């Protein structure tokens, strides 16, 4: 079980942040807010603070400096995190708060994979990377309130062939990321890629988790 370092008053101790990290955090928090609103899950509403924390937690660890969240270098780690999450649920001892925090972590990695500077095809400088992250912060905050973003989640929700196991999820991530690498990249397009991927992945993971533990309440529309 993952643990954070806390003080006597329950304060979360986090490493000092760079301006780049602050910009990344705001983009991830905007995405998390969108997913919370669209999923319409009472359980997530109860544990949304944990989901928000998970969505920024990977950027708040020293490991981020030496192991940036790039598909080529961290995808295997993400797969392990997802498999560990399912095992945690299957153990029957999983806590809802921890499950939603870990789901937030998964969303963080997926969002980074579909952010241009986090891929080997990006050949810009560190300054270019920071400027892209700055623009992404503003673009994501705006995009999640558009009709296009709302339509994406609804389309994913109604889509046939919902993901039912981790093999299907991994296949989808890998295929979609390969397509993404061959596409034109800009901030607006990245926002759409991220929203599409995270919407489909979150719906799929909730499907898998609810089937792994029948005590968990499925979403009202999940098996409609």
Please place each PLM-identified region on the residue numbering.
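N-terminal leader/auxiliary helical segments
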Residues: 2-105, 110-224
């Amino acid at each position: 079980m993952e643990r954070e370092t806390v003080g006597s008053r329950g304060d979360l101790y986090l490493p000092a942040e760079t301006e780049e990290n602050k910009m990344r955090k705001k983009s991830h928090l905007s995405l998390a807010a969108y997913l919370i609103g669209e999923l319409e899950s009472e359980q997530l509403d109860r544990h949304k603070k944990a989901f928000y924390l998970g969505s920024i937690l990977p950027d708040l660890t020293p490991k981020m400096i030496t192991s940036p969240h790039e598909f080529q270098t961290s995808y295997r780690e993400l797969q392990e995190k997802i498999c560990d999450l399912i095992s945690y649920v299957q153990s029957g001892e999983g806590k809802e708060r921890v499950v939603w925090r870990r789901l937030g972590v998964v969303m963080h990695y997926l969002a980074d994979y579909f952010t241009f500077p986090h891929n080997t095809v990006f050949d810009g400088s560190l300054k270019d990377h920071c400027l892209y992250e700055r623009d992404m912060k503003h673009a994501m905050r705006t995009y999640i309130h558009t009709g296009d973003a709302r339509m994406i989640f609804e389309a994913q929700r109604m889509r046939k062939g919902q993901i039912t196991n981790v093999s299907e999820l991994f296949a989808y991530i890998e295929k979609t990321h390969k397509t993404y690498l061959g596409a034109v990249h800009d901030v607006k397009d990245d926002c759409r890629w991220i929203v599409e991927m995270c919407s489909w992945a979150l719906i799929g993971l909730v499907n898998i988790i609810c089937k792994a533990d029948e005590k968990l309440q499925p979403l009202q529309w999940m098996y409609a």
